[in-house]
Amino acid sequence: MAVTNQMVAPRYAKALLEAAQDQNQVETVHEELQALQSVFNDNPTILTIFDNARITAADKDALMTTLTKDASPLVANLLKLTQQYGRFGALPAIISAFNQAYDEEAGIIAATVTTAVALSADQADALRSTIAARFGMKSTQLDQVVDPSVIGGVRIQARGSVIDGTVKHRFDKMKAALLAD
């Protein structure tokens, strides 16, 4: 069975987080990984260059030098290691897994909140507090989605859980109950 990027990403991320903690470099590594993610988002072809046989070794070395020039030793080693083992394309998944582990360590939960209208600052703050308390975390990173089709109420998605208190959801449940036997 082939090992996929999604399978190896948590292993690399965990090892990187532990090494960063040992060297008291967690914030530095986190910031550098966010910058790398931006580079990959802007230039997705970078992820395939090291697997491309038509690109010379000198060009690959030049790219690696550019990528690692301002990086901390931990991030530079991650880049070199993933390139060496043919896992450079896994870097977005590794960064995502690192971010999840980083948030977990920091007591931050990411949540997506869907409402019919935009939340006020006070409402968003109240939801952040409620979600953090519900999941036993310190704070909530809130992604707000406005979807008029929910009619009213709120749908919260966090850690694979969905708490749906929307009017549309209630209507759908009533409709299903009425149509049942």
Curated annotation (Swiss-Prot):
Return the Gene3D superfamilies for the record.
N-terminal domain of the delta subunit of the F1F0-ATP synthase (1.10.520.20)
Where it mainly occurs, coarsely classed, is membrane
Q: Which UniProt keywords apply?
A: ATP synthesis, Cell membrane, CF(1), Hydrogen ion transport, Ion transport, Membrane, Transport
Q: Which GO terms describe its cellular component?
A: plasma membrane; proton-transporting ATP synthase complex
Q: What functional role does this protein have?
A: F(1)F(0) ATP synthase produces ATP from ADP in the presence of a proton or sodium gradient. F-type ATPases consist of two structural domains, F(1) containing the extramembraneous catalytic core and F(0) containing the membrane proton channel, linked together by a central stalk and a peripheral stalk. During catalysis, ATP synthesis in the catalytic domain of F(1) is coupled via a rotary mechanism of the central stalk subunits to proton translocation. This protein is part of the stalk that links CF(0) to CF(1). It either transmits conformational changes from CF(0) to CF(1) or is implicated in proton conduction.
Q: How does it assemble?
A: F-type ATPases have 2 components, F(1) - the catalytic core - and F(0) - the membrane proton channel. F(1) has five subunits: alpha(3), beta(3), gamma(1), delta(1), epsilon(1). F(0) has three main subunits: a(1), b(2) and c(10-14). The alpha and beta chains form an alternating ring which encloses part of the gamma chain. F(1) is attached to F(0) by a central stalk formed by the gamma and epsilon chains, while a peripheral stalk is formed by the delta and b chains.
Name of the molecule in the record: ATP synthase subunit delta
Please name the source species: Lacticaseibacillus paracasei (strain ATCC 334 / BCRC 17002 / CCUG 31169 / CIP 107868 / KCTC 3260 / NRRL B-441) (Lactobacillus paracasei)
| Lineage of origin | Bacteria, Bacillati, Bacillota, Bacilli, Lactobacillales
